[in-house]
From Swiss-Prot:
Glycans are attached at residue 270. Belongs to the prominin family. The modification Phosphoserine is found at residue 819. This is Prominin-2. Its main location: membrane. One of its GO terms (molecular function) is cholesterol binding. Residues 28-106, 175-435, 500-780 are extracellular. GO terms for biological process: negative regulation of caveolin-mediated endocytosis; negative regulation of pinocytosis; positive regulation of cell projection organization. One of its GO terms (cellular component) is basolateral plasma membrane. It holds the Pfam family Prominin. The gene is Prom2. The chain crosses the membrane at residues 107-127, 154-174, 436-456, 479-499, 781-801.
Length: 835
């Protein structure tokens, strides 16, 4: 089946235009290999984890702040470095006046407590003796005008004082219980902290080994992705080359079709020309015979009409028009294209396309040996990681560190047990004394309630005086309890104040300001047995303050402790040599695509034969000259019709019969000879025009295409290697990213968790939280609230004694106003006494 030249040329030109140039090499998009996975590493469990303690906020924080401000007023002196130095190094040479000078605020408070301890019991004894003789604390003798105002004022002051006592008692109860509940965990936290610090250095090698073992995580991930690297690289090459290969194969297919069309038309041209020449040899004698007979018949004397002369003219022109023996020969071209095409271009293109589409599988098969070598190199462990734990220089420092902390732990246990024991005694005594204050508060409140009830009941003449008397007795009972518990209260307050206040002002305040660290760093301040820098194994050029700050910032152990400075974490984490070996193995991979030929040898021979055939040199105009001529110069069908008309006009039957016979034979000759030749001429015309339009461009395109394919086959391996190299670099970058994730994770784990000295600073911070926040703050708040209640017992005693007088019944009544009125009227009558 032939094709229209108008459709073939644009298709061929487009396909060739796409195939003539190879795309420039560009760097492949690494995203085509897929998303980089985020590796999940198991958190290395620490044998002893030291969690930082944080002071929890609560409703008592404002009270703690008030106590601290009070203590800052009591103790205005700075940290006594010289006094503490003397006390630690030569206790016998400590001067009392220096201690008193530093503790001046506490001495003043001690004087106040002493006065309280002396005066309150004496006052209580005197009041007791006075009450026994019924000379004080009695009742109101007479009623007067200002009595109600005095009584109301005293009751209000007593109520306010009682409320203050109640608030202080509640706070004392709360802080007492909070102190006791915090002491147990605080005492327990001290050995736990020391135990955790003992493993600060000794546990590092074991944890480093656990870190090194997790190198298998990136190894497994890389090994998993290596299984599909061949197919992935093949897909990358396929995607990059398909914009080149597919147009080339389309051009091959189009050229094959054009070649087939050209040969088909060339063969048709040759066959048709031969057939036309043969047909003309058979057509010429009958045409010539008809011409001669018609001329002889029509040139007779009877043919004198106009119609006859016209027919005579047509008969005279009855001869062959085209001479196909004059057409150019095409035998040489046909000879050159003999047996062309030998290749089935459609099948060849499908095979090449299938080969190209199987490129990922082909690359995967070729990559098997390379992947095996890469996995072999991958299975090894870098030298630095193998020595990560063994090279850690912590054995000597760990021994010294552990011995120091173990000794400190052993020495601290008896003291901690005593602290817990004495705290229990303090808690019991605190509960008893808080209960005593509660008893005073209850007596005051009940006394006030009954006393006020009794006052209202006096308006009734039939009232009983028992309510007021009971209220007064309850108030006096509260006074008795106040005198009774004043001594243990002031003693407990002063002892706890002296201990807790000095802990806060001497230790906690200097700890927060850093003066305590500076004191420990100053040479000579501590005795040789308490050389903390030596015991802790700190570097000689690093002070405790510097060690604390560096550890707080996350410094590693070998930067602070006396370890071997040759330990270099970055050197152990340098896996460049390991990854370089993997890169070399993978970069040595080359793809062999000999099976991808694009143009088979036989197809090339067909196209080269077409190129050498001289198809474009055929003189197609020579064919068109003969084609444009008619087969017979006269229209034989019209001539036959003219003869029929002329025959009908004749009277001579013989002449009429002859004309009709000629007309019939002309029609028969036309149908049998001329019409088939005209069909052959039409066929020849189509082939000639197709070849004339197709041959020049086909020759040029074939030549260009062969040059392009030759160049492409030379450049394609280079292009493939370039694409493969870029894709391999992308893959290696991706895989090296997994090792980078591991190195980053190891560096963070080692410097921030495993080999960091941060637990040292955390232990110091925890010590401050334990001593100052968990113990000292509630302890100081307890004595503050208890002291508050203790000193408010004095106004409570005074107001209770004063108020109780007004609750007892009045035995005598003296009213100046009523007496005067009685004297004016001179009416003798019995007056009732208001009790």
């Amino acid at each position: 089946m032939t094709r229209s030249p108008g459709l073939m040329v644009p298709l061929l030109g487009l396909s060739l235009g796409l195939a003539l140039s190879l795309p420039e090499a560009v760097t492949d998009d690494c995203g085509s290999l897929g998303r980089v996975e985020h590796l999940a590493f198991a958190r290395v469990p620490r044998t002893r984890e030291l969690a930082p303690l944080v002071r929890a906020s609560g409703p008592l924080n404002s009270l703690y702040g008030t106590v601290r401000r009070f203590l800052s007023v009591v103790q205005l002196n700075p940290f006594p470095a010289e006094l503490i130095k003397t006390l630690l190094n030569d206790p016998s040479s400590v001067k009392t006046d220096e201690v008193v000078r530093y503790e001046a605020g506490y001495v003043v408070c001690a004087v106040i407590a002493g006065l309280y301890l002396l005066l309150v019991p004496i006052t209580g004894l005197c009041f007791c003796c006075c009450r026994c003789r019924q000379r004080c604390g009695g009742r109101v003798k007479t009623e007067h005008k200002a009595m109600a105002c005095e009584r109301g004022t005293l009751m209000i002051f007593l109520l306010l004082t009682t409320l203050v006592l109640l608030i202080g008692m509640v706070c004392a109860f709360a802080t007492n219980q909070h102190t006791h509940s915090q002491t147990g965990p605080s005492v327990k936290a001290v050995p736990e902290t020391l135990l955790s610090l003992r493993g600060l250095v000794s546990d590092v090698p074991e944890e480093l080994r656990a870190i090194a073992e997790q190198f298998s995580v990136p190894q497994k991930q890389v090994s998993k992705e290596l299984d599909g690297v061949g197919e992935n690289l093949g897909n990358v090459i396929h995607n990059r080359l398909k914009s080149t290969v597919y147009p080339v194969l389309a051009s091959v297919h189009s050229l094959g079709q054009a070649l087939q069309v050209s040969i088909d038309h060339l063969r048709a041209l040759n066959t048709t020309s031969v057939e036309l020449q043969e047909a003309q040899r058979h057509l010429e004698p009958p045409v010539q015979a008809h011409r001669e007979r018609l001329l002889a018949l029509l040139q007779d004397s009877w043919c004198h009409e106009e119609n006859c002369k016209r027919v005579l003219s047509q008969a005279g022109a009855l001869q062959l028009g085209a001479d196909f023996s004059q057409t150019p020969p095409v035998d040489d071209v046909l000879h050159r294209l003999k047996d062309v095409p030998e290749t089935n271009f459609s099948s060849m293109v499908q095979e090449e396309k299938a080969t190209f589409n199987n490129l990922p599988l082909l690359v995967q098969v070729q990559a098997v040996s390379v992947v095996k070598d890469v996995k072999k190199a991958l299975a090894e462990q870098p030298e630095g990681l193998r020595m990560l734990a063994q090279a850690f220089p912590g054995s000597e420092a760990a021994s010294r560190w552990s011995q120091a902390l173990e000794g400190l732990e052993q020495r601290s246990r008896p003291y901690l047990q005593e602290v817990q024991q004495y705290e229990t005694y303090r808690w019991i005594l605190g509960c008893v004394l808080c209960s005593a204050i509660l008893l005073v508060v209850i007596c005051n409140l009940l006394g006030l309630s009954l006393g006020i009830w009794g006052l209202f009941a006096r308006e009734d003449p039939s009232h009983s005086e028992t309510k007021g008397e009971a209220g007064a007795r309850l108030l006096m009972a509260g006074v008795a309890f106040s005198f009774l518990f004043a001594v243990p209260l002031i003693l407990l307050v002063f002892v706890t104040f002296l201990v807790g206040g000095n802990v806060q002002t001497l230790v906690c305040r200097s700890w927060e300001s850093g003066e305590l660290y500076e004191f420990a760093d100053t040479p000579g301040n501590l005795p040789p047995s308490m050389n903390l820098s030596y015991l802790l194994g700190l570097k000689k050029n690093i002070s405790i303050v510097q060690a604390y700050r560096q550890c707080k910032a996350g410094a590693v152990l070998w930067k602070v402790l006396q370890l071997n400075d040759s330990y270099d974490l970055d050197k152990h984490l340098d896996i460049k040599q390991y990854t370089h070996k993997i890169q070399q193995e993978l970069q040595s991979f080359q793809v062999d695509l000999k099976e991808l030929d694009l143009l088979s040898p036989t197809a090339r021979q067909d196209l080269e034969a077409l190129q050498r055939s001289g198809l474009e040199k055929i003189h197609y105009r020579g064919f068109l000259v003969q084609i444009q001529k008619p087969v017979v110069n006269t229209d034989m069908w019209q001539l036959a019709q003219e003869l029929e008309g002329l025959a009908q006009a004749q009277n001579d039957s013989l002449l009429r019969q002859q004309l009709r016979e000629e007309a019939r034979e002309l029609r028969s000759l036309y149908q049998e000879k001329v019409v088939p030749q005209e069909s052959l001429v039409t066929k020849l015309n189509f082939s000639v025009k197709t070849l004339e339009s197709l041959a020049p461009s086909l020759q040029v395109n074939t030549s260009d295409f062969l040059d392009s394919v030759t160049r492409l086959k030379g450049e394609l391996p280079v292009q493939i290697n370039h694409i493969l190299r870029n894709a391999t670099e992308c893959f290696l970058t991706r895989e090296m990213g997994y090792f980078s994730q591991y190195v980053t994770w190891v560096r963070a784990e080692v410097t921030q968790r495993i080999a960091t000295c941060q637990p040292f600073s955390t232990a110091l911070d925890n010590g401050h939280v334990i001593l100052c926040d968990m113990m000292a703050d509630p302890w100081n708040a307890f004595w503050f609230c208890l002291g508050w209640c203790t000193f408010f017992l004095i106004p409570s005693i005074i107001f209770a004694v004063k108020t109780s007088k007004y609750f007892r019944p009045i035995r005598k009544r003296l009213s100046s106003t009523s007496s005067e009125e009685t004297q004016l009227f001179h009416i003798p009558r019995v007056t009732s006494l208001k009790l």
